[in-house]
Amino acid sequence: MDSMEAVWWGKFCVWGTNKHPPLSGFPAYGIYLLFSENIKAVYILSQICITVGFCFIYKLASLLLEQRKAVLSVMLLEGCVFYGFCSPEYNVNVMSLALWPAVAYFFYRAVTENTLCLWCLAAIACAANFLNKYTAAWQLLGCAGFLFFTPEGRKMLKSYRPYVALAVFLLLIFPHFYWLWQHDFMVIEYFSSRSGGVYGQEMPLWENVLHHLISPAEFLVSMLFYGAGTLALFFAFSRSLEPEEIDFGSRRFLFWLGLFPLLLVLAYGLISGSPVK
C-alpha cells in the first residue's frame, strides 16, 4: 500500500502531502514510468535505497576504521530487520535508510575537510532527508549539536562555508514550507491522529506518568528486538577483532549523529507520552 501511495504522490508532482514531505514520490513514479507503468518496479527501488545506504555506510566507516572492519560494519546490518524483512516494500522509511547514511557521510567529510563543495553536498543530503520524512529533524539537530557543542564544530563556524550550506538547505526546503502554508499545514492533523488514542485522553496522574514512561520504553525494546540479529553478529565477530583507536573528534561525531538522535526520540516520548516509532 505504501508503494502505491508513493507512486500516486509522485504522479501529481506536488511539494507536499497530507502525511509526509514529497520526495519519496518522485523516484517512485519515475521508476514506475520507466518500467511501462509496472507497479512491481517500485520494489526494485527499495533495494536500490538499501544498496545506496550500504555504500554510504561503508564509505563513512572506511574513514574511521580499517577496510576489513568497514566491510564488516555493512555486513552486520544484514541482521537488522529494517535491512531485510521490512525492505521489500518501498516507503519513506526505506528511503531513509539511504539518506541518513548519506547525510552522515557528507557531513563528516565537510567538517573534516571543510571545502565548499562538501558543505553544499551535505546541505543537499540534509534537505533530501528532510523532504523525505520529518523525523530527519532528529539527525539535523545532531548536526547542529556537533557544530555548536564540540571544538571541531565551533572551529567550522568561523568559516563562511557552513553558512552557505545553511542557505542552500533553506532554499531547497522552502518550496515545501510554502506548500504547507498554502494548505494550512494540513500535515499537523496527521500528526495529531498518530499521537491520539489514550495518549490524548484525560486520565489519573499515575496513569499519565506510566504512559510517559511506557512510550520510550516500548520504542527502545522494539529497536533492540529489530536489531537483535546485528547485535548478535557484532558480539560474535568482535572477539576475533582488535579494538580500533578512534580519535576524540570522531567519537564526538559518532555521538552527535549516532546516539544523540536516539536520545532525542526517547526524550520526546518521555515528555509527550505519545507513541514513538
Name what the model sees in each region.
Residues 85-96:
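Short acidic/glycine- and proline-prone juxtamembrane loop motifs at membrane-interface regions
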Residues 44-65, 79, 102-106:
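Transmembrane-helix motifs of polytopic, lipid-linked glycan transferases
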Residues 12, 118-134, 168-173:
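Membrane-interface alpha helices of multi-pass inner-membrane proteins
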Residues 1-6, 16-31, 36-40, 93, ...:
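Extracytoplasmic catalytic/substrate-binding loops of multi-pass membrane glycan-assembly enzymes
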Residues 130, 255-276:
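Transmembrane-helix signature of polytopic, lipid-linked glycan biosynthesis machinery
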Residues 140-251, 261, 269:
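Transmembrane-lumen/periplasm boundary regions of multi-pass, lipid-linked membrane glycan transferases
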Residues 73-81, 126, 130:
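Short helix- or helix-capping micro-motifs
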Residues 65-67, 103-119:
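Membrane-interface transmembrane helices that cradle and orient dolichyl/undecaprenyl
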